[in-house]
């Protein structure tokens, strides 16, 4: 379900909309039946108007609503790169909020990162950014140790801590 964006800075956004509500029950019912669910970036208002939605917002809100563990975002690039051009493999939400979001100048990129932060802060454990132009990119990201994109999570994935008695079985095996 969608609502109109309205007038922003004196510009009528016409048929551009925002996600108002996701019917998670309907999506989960289909997923539980073993079906693949494709969600288009279109939304309908309560009065039947059709609105164009951003795919980032739709993906984020659907992932949050269905309590997804992962969100995979296929974009124009394979993730975030450092100043030398090397791919950054892992980032935390807090790092992005403190260090990165204010340095992004391009509105589309800022919108993407704001949506990814929103997903992370609302229960999506891992968000992967993968280059849509790489053949087999999703498989390479998910099923190789290094992956090919950038992964965002609330907390660092690798935490160093002292071993406990419960860890002995895993250490010895």
Labelled PLM ranges:
Residues 1-172:
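C-terminal catalytic "cap/lid" subdomain
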